[in-house]
């Protein structure tokens, strides 16, 4: 019974990003080596919207803001080709492998409509839309 309690507590306190093990590389920034991943195991489709997690893992630790990676829960509309990050978590370790030390919510007013096909934002949204079909 103690073991079951331990695992329940551990699972509850781990951030979502660490619980997932299906992060797939979407693109790597050729200028700075940063990588963006998408969690292919948790893409949800509701009406004309999709919901998914992405992760930015920097090549180097960000000394200015004291983090290494960021995970974000995203809402997207593939027909109108836009997305917004509903929740953003900052992590002190690579690949979101520790509990988030900072969380932002209520970012739904920031809508991103990528135009350039070679931009990271465009590639992320196109990949998520393709995977949701």
Describe each region flagged by the PLM:
Residues 4-18:
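Sec-dependent N-terminal signal peptides
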Residues 19-72, 77-133:
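N-terminal secretory-pathway/extracellular module detecting exported/lumenal segments
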């Amino acid at each position: 019974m103690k073991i079951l309690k331990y695992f329940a507590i551990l699972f509850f306190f781990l951030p979502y990003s660490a619980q997932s093990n299906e992060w797939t590389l979407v693109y790597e920034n050729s200028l700075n080596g940063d990588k963006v991943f998408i969690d292919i195991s948790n893409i949800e489709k509701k009406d004309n919207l999709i919901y998914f997690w992405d992760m930015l893992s920097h090549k180097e630790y960000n000394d200015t803001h004291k983090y290494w990676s960021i995970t974000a829960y995203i809402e997207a509309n593939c027909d109108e080709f836009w997305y917004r990050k509903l929740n953003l978590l900052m992590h002190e370790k690579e690949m979101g492998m520790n509990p988030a030390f900072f969380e932002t919510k209520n970012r739904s007013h920031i809508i991103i409509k990528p135009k350039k096909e070679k931009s990271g934002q465009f590639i992320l949204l196109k990949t998520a839309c393709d995977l949701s079909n």
